[in-house]
UniProtKB/Swiss-Prot annotation:
Catalyzes the reversible formation of acyl-phosphate (acyl-PO(4)) from acyl-[acyl-carrier-protein] (acyl-ACP). This enzyme utilizes acyl-ACP as fatty acyl donor, but not acyl-CoA. Its EC number is 2.3.1.274. GO terms for cellular component: cytoplasm. It catalyses: a fatty acyl-[ACP] + phosphate = an acyl phosphate + holo-[ACP]. HAMAP family: PlsX. This is Phosphate acyltransferase. Pfam families: FA_synthesis. The keyword Nucleus does not apply. It comes from Francisella tularensis subsp. novicida (strain U112). Keywords: Cytoplasm, Lipid biosynthesis, Lipid metabolism, Phospholipid biosynthesis, Phospholipid metabolism, Transferase. GO terms for biological process: fatty acid biosynthetic process; phospholipid biosynthetic process. GO terms for molecular function: phosphate:acyl-[acyl carrier protein] acyltransferase activity. Belongs to the PlsX family.
Amino acid sequence: MGYKISIDAMGGDHGLNTTIPAALEAVKKDSNLQIVLVGDHHKVKRALDRYSKVKKIKLPVLQRIAIHHASETVGMDESPSIAVRKKKDSSMRVAINLVKDRTVDACVSAGNTGALMATSKFVLKTINGVDRPAIVYALPAFNRETKQLSKTYMLDLGANVVCTSEQLFQFAIMGSILAASSKGIAEPRVSLLNIGEEEMKGLDNIKNAAKLLQGCDFINYNGYIEGKYIFDDTTDVIVCDGFVGNVSLKTMEGSLRLIESLIKKTIQESSLLMKIPIVMALPIFKKMKKGMNLDSFNGASLLGLTGIVVKSHGGASANAFETAIYEAIKEIKYNIPKTIQESLEKVL
C-alpha cells in the first residue's frame, strides 16, 4: 500500500537543513512512500538538489518527491492567532490543507507547536466526540523484569493547560487506541498521572476521570501512576493535562542533560589512573546512550483531529525528523483518526 505525506519543509529551528535530508532518507528506505515538500519552491529545490547529490539519491527515488510552493513561513515564536488568521499561505498551513483535501495522507512539521495545533484544529477540525485535540509522545520505558526497553505513550503534553474529567477520559481512549495499534497489544494499560496511588489523592478532575475510566469496559484502567514511575514499564498510556505533561516532559529533558554533563565532568576531572577503567567502559556507555537516544522517540501526534498531523521537535536532527515521518506512516497504516472515531461512538 502506498502513502503520501506532506512536510512543512520550512518549519523548525533548522528548516531545510533538517527536513530535506530526512525526507530523502525516508523515501530511499521506503519504496511505498511519496513526499510533498511544502515551502518556498526556489529554496526547497536548491536544497533538494544539493542534498540529493551529497546522498547520491537515484532518479527513481527523487521521482517520489514533489514540491508544493508556499510563500510564507510561520516563525518559531509567532503567535498562533497570527499564524491562523494572517499566514494563510504558510508552509505549515498549506501542508495541513493538503491533508484536508486528501491530496496526502498525513502531515509532519517541526514548526511552532502552538501554531501547528491551532492551524490543525482550524483546518481539519476535531473528531465527533472529542472536545480538544491532545499532544501525545512516546517515552522510553524500561521493564525491570525482562530488562527490555519499550515505549509508554503520554498525553496531553501542552495543548490543553486545564482539562475537565471528560476531556481526560477522551485522552485515555485516544491514547489507548494509539498504543494498541503501535505496540500491537489488545488491551493497553492506561494510567492517570497523579501525586499518589491512593484513590483519595489528587484534584477533583483526576478523581472524576478515574471513575469514568473504571466504568468503561473499553479501557484497561491501571489506576494512578506517580511521576517517579513514568520510565518504568508498568503502563502503556499515561494521561494528564497539558500543564503537568509539558512540565514533566521538559523536566525529563533537563534531567538527561544534567546526567550527561555530570558524566563528562567526572571524566574530565578524573586522574589518569581513574580514566583507564572509564575508557574500558566506553562501549557500555555508548550502548546506554544509544538506548536513551531521544532521536528514536521523536514525533508527537496531534490526536483527536480528523486527519493525521505529527509534530517533530523544533530542534530535531535529520535523523530525529526521519523518525517523525515513520510515526506518521504508522498512523496512516492503522488509520488512527477513523479508529478513534469508531471507538468513541461505542463508548460515548
